[in-house]
């Protein structure tokens, strides 16, 4: 959903678009709630309130002020992520249809021959960091840039077994045109940048679990963040390999040597960050022209000093000359060194060339050892070739993708590695490593152990659901880690599957009730965005690849109506009720019927069941940004911070009724997951609320009416407005509450319209218009620990006779209250009041 705020209506009609005019009779929160539950994708919001827009954005729903027609046309035709703090729109708009172009934000790609392999008539477009270079295309009242790129397809090609790039990219573009937009991938880059900048400024120690290559630029400016990954491939691990020969295989039609060099340097850099938590000087020997340095500098102020007879245009200090072992003394401490020396083969025969390569490998290794032999805070990455070698057993092996697999690989060493035990590694073993291993991640830090960290903020995005983690340990970490943002895969199967397959792995599945957290927000991706100053135009869809975002230790926990709130809670219900159901009131009717309340007259305005809880349960796959458990808990402890809106606090029994209705719904749908979720939420309600039932009552509240439009033979027909189980000493407390509610009780619009047999020989008249006040009264008694109401649903009625009678129907007739009283069952009236 996207909300585009206009000061006046537009003449043009757009598909999947609805107009909402601000309702001055309602406050900003109520307007925001009504907007959020509209069913179209585009909402044109007229006569808007800025406060309402703020409320929607905090809820993760993109809402933007529009000043020009161009702005409206641009935003209505594509999806986007909105930074509502800095007023920046990040479009996710592929431009195939306007410019026949493939988009990239990696500068090195533009310096390859990739255009030779694009579709006929197509070109490559460089858009800069998150589309920064496209800002000039949009002369808007807000900052706007198009962050959509095809880098995901380019990188997937590099790691795939496909060689024909044109066929590969054509297939990927067709996939993009026939499947839903990978909005999370596009939006996630914006989110990660914002997230870690915020966390580093707010927390002294941040830990990140499971980063992948898509985050390799995000952390360049955050050396203090401790990374945990899958660990490195060490020299000593080659002991498991059998010897092989040179294979030789082309991985890419266009030259990706620069990409390999970038990955090597970034892997080395993150090793340095892991050890020293600060930025080093980056020395590079060879590897010109290194256009990728431009990409790195978009994200960080890292300094590069380079040596190569060829130009390196983006280096801070370039020496256009060869580098020798004697030059190592020029290199300072607190640095990394990348050695990529290899002369061109030119016309040399194979044997001569092989001899040169082995000599250069020995020379490269000598430079590395010399660099690491003195000083402090140093890490080196050196180019190697498959040959008989003695190498430190703790050194890390790298084999990032390159244009052709031949005989080269890379070795990362720190000072300690260079002095560690060395082992002889035969050439054939190194060929086996090269032929069968592609390094897939620049993050090669040690794996994360599933244990609580006392002083750190833990971030684990899409990293802990894998079934090689112990599920109980994951739950324990979420429950006990005081400061964290952790995601786990949500269980949106229908058979309550404990794990689901994803790509070539299996993930555990989770529901919010799997966790026991009292100070954590459990929400969706879009709900999480709102807490970090972002909103999105396309909400999460129940694809099977959805995650719960669990934020622990956030200062937004008590702000119940501002973040992870009830916005859009009825949206899925509206979509179904107005397009597929037998009646638009089907939800209300089902909730009443499933709790044995058969008086459906006015059910849409007088309902016994919490619609919020019911919708949050049965449609949780469509909207789990609403943190239901937090909502229940904060109300149960009376700690909810409510900023505005027509906010109705439910009585705990209404929540129980909702769970029962959801359970009935789940059985009809054969939805085992909702069935379990409903049971567990009901158990949670009973846990946090101390609900007691007056199933053996000794007092009741009665309402006597001035007029009863039916024949009756009981002595005093009345409405039993709830029963109590109290001691005589509590009577004054009950009376005090009744007096407090006096005006509201006498203002009730009480009506009746038919009679019916409640059971055999109990003839009653229906009563409407009292449920809302009944549940408010229930809440007041609950807060004073007064037992009021029974476990079965309260069905308001007036007993007319204790014999079987014929059902009577009349027009809706108002019942005027004569007086209200408190009486002991089989005893005397102890209190009464009149208007």
Swiss-Prot record:
It holds the Pfam family Rotavirus_VP3. PROSITE patterns: SAM_MT56_VP3. Residues 171-245, 429-555 are annotated as: N7-methyltransferase activity. Interacts with VP1. Interacts with VP2. Residues 556-692 are annotated as: GTase/RTPase activity. It is found in: Virion. Coiled coil: none annotated. Residues 246-428 are annotated as: 2'-O-methyltransferase activity. Belongs to the rotavirus VP3 family. It comes from Rotavirus A (strain RVA/Cow/France/RF/1975/G6P6[1]) (RV-A). GO terms for cellular component: viral nucleocapsid. The active site is at residues 718, 720, 797, 799. Contains a bipartite N7-methyltransferase domain, a 2'-O-methyltransferase domain and a GTase/RTPase domain. The C-terminus contains a phosphodiesterase domain that degrades the 5'-triphosphorylated, 2'-5' linked adenylate oligomers produced by the host cell in response to IFN stimulation. GO terms for molecular function: GTP binding; hydrolase activity; mRNA 5'-cap (guanine-N7-)-methyltransferase activity; mRNA guanylyltransferase activity; RNA binding. Its EC number is 3.1.4.-, 2.7.7.50, 2.1.1.56. This is Protein VP3. The lineage of its organism: Viruses, Riboviria, Orthornavirae, Duplornaviricota, Resentoviricetes. Keywords: GTP-binding, Host-virus interaction, Hydrolase, Inhibition of host innate immune response by virus, Methyltransferase, mRNA capping, mRNA processing, Multifunctional enzyme, Nucleotide-binding, Nucleotidyltransferase, RNA-binding, S-adenosyl-L-methionine, Transferase, Viral immunoevasion, Virion. It catalyses: a 5'-end diphospho-ribonucleoside in mRNA + GTP + H(+) = a 5'-end (5'-triphosphoguanosine)-ribonucleoside in mRNA + diphosphate; a 5'-end (5'-triphosphoguanosine)-ribonucleoside in mRNA + S-adenosyl-L-methionine = a 5'-end (N(7)-methyl 5'-triphosphoguanosine)-ribonucleoside in mRNA + S-adenosyl-L-homocysteine; 5'-triphosphoadenylyl-(2'->5')-adenylyl-(2'->5')-adenosine + 2 H2O = 2 AMP + ATP + 2 H(+). Residues 693-835 are annotated as: 2'-5'-phosphodiesterase activity.
